A protein has these predicted regions:
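Short polar/charged helix/loop
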Residues: 1-184
Length: 184
């Protein structure tokens, strides 16, 4: 759901970016029917979605890696250690972005993310933590998926509002920004 929400919000703001989703478990699985419904409520289409596994190549090409849980960020950092400064859980990224304030137009995304990550250590992501983890709605009711989608939409809004606060321009937003959303 985050891939669709993030891509939709970036499109709405006129930000040119490539957004991909990758997970830890499955390749080729369709989106859960409840995910499809929750996104259809927002006029976002998941009908053609197929899951894919996170790979070193995908991580290497991403300017930002967003995990739904700490374990996703840990696995990304284990697969490719240099991804650590640009890998966050969605909740962590929204929290750190809110604390830091909007990215100035003259500061590249990579530099702004490095500032957000400056005081972190890899041990910060040991174990699970509800303050960082988005509960996985798989196997739950449509109502649970809709509540999850509301939370994700709010968090994505915070992230985009801080990463791309100004009207986009070719100088402020490189068209090759790539964002990877990692889910289980």
């Amino acid at each position: 759901m985050v891939e669709a929400l993030l891509a939709g919000e970036l499109r709405r703001r006129g930000v040119e970016a490539t957004v991909h989703s990758a997970g830890l478990l499955f390749d080729g699985r369709a989106a859960d029917p409840h995910s499809v419904s929750a996104m259809a409520d927002r006029e976002l289409d998941l009908s053609g979605f197929a899951s894919r596994k996170m790979t070193e190549s995908l991580l290497r090409s991403a300017d930002l890696v967003i995990g739904m849980e700490r374990r996703h960020v840990r696995e990304a950092a284990v697969a490719l250690p240099e991804v650590w400064p640009r890998a966050f859980t969605l909740k962590e990224l929204a929290r750190r972005a809110s604390a830091a304030g909007p990215r100035p137009d003259d500061v590249p995304v990579e530099d702004w993310l490095a500032r957000l990550a400056a005081d972190r250590t890899t041990t910060d992501h040991l174990g699970d933590d509800p303050s960082d983890d988005v509960p996985d709605p798989i196997g739950r009711s449509l109502r649970t998926f809709r509540r999850c989608a509301e939370d994700l939409e709010r968090l994505v809004g915070v992230v985009v509002e801080h990463l791309w606060p100004a009207s986009p321009s070719t100088d402020a937003v490189p068209s090759n920004d790539a964002v990877r959303s990692t889910t289980a």
